[in-house]
Amino acid sequence: NQIGWSGVRKRKKNLLTLIEEKINNLGEENVKILDVAGGTGNYLFDIKEKYPKVEILINEFKKSNIEVGEEVIKKNNLENISFVNYDCFDKETYKKINYTPNIVIISGVFELFEDNNMLENTISGVAEILDKNGAIIYTGQPWHPQLKQIALVLNSHKGNNKSWLMRRR
């Protein structure tokens, strides 16, 4: 029940609220969601359960996360939800996936990387494929109350044994 985890749960709740609002505005049958760095797809399974007609594509760089997510898909017999394994910071990635989303999710990734050009590549790539009536839903953790603790306790997401560092964006 540490304050940081409380914030993560609130962020998930707020993210789901925004996604559901956009789904309801577009009409469930017409929704195509892309998560640019979706991890295991955790919260998107909540969306899929509530809105089974929504099409979801989750891009994730870590194959172990994809394996976990694909197990959930298989176990629950979910349709129209899948993973791809591309570099979310490569602008060309978004052309390669051949997908025109009307909801793009960028959540919990930008604060982990220091190179602003990488982030610009993501945004530019997404902007090129986003449906004209689409929306980008972005979340960050600019005022996370436990940034120092995270840096000292968690392993790096990059696998290089450096301290975890979150940037305020």
State where each predicted segment sits.
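Conserved Class I S-adenosyl-L-methionine-dependent methyltransferase catalytic core
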Residues: 1-26
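Conserved SAM-binding loop of SAM-dependent methyltransferases across substrates and taxa
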Residues: 40-52
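Conserved SAM/SAH-binding beta-strand->alpha-helix loop
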Residues: 62-64
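Conserved SAM-binding loop
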Residues: 69-70
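A conserved beta-strand element that flanks and buttresses the S-adenosyl-L-methionine
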Residues: 105
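A short glycine-rich, Lys/Arg-flanked "PGG" loop and its adjoining helix->strand segment in the class I
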Residues: 120-132
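Conserved beta-strand signature within the Rossmann-like core of class I S-adenosyl-L-methionine
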Residues: 133-140
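Conserved Class I S-adenosyl-L-methionine
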Residues: 149-169
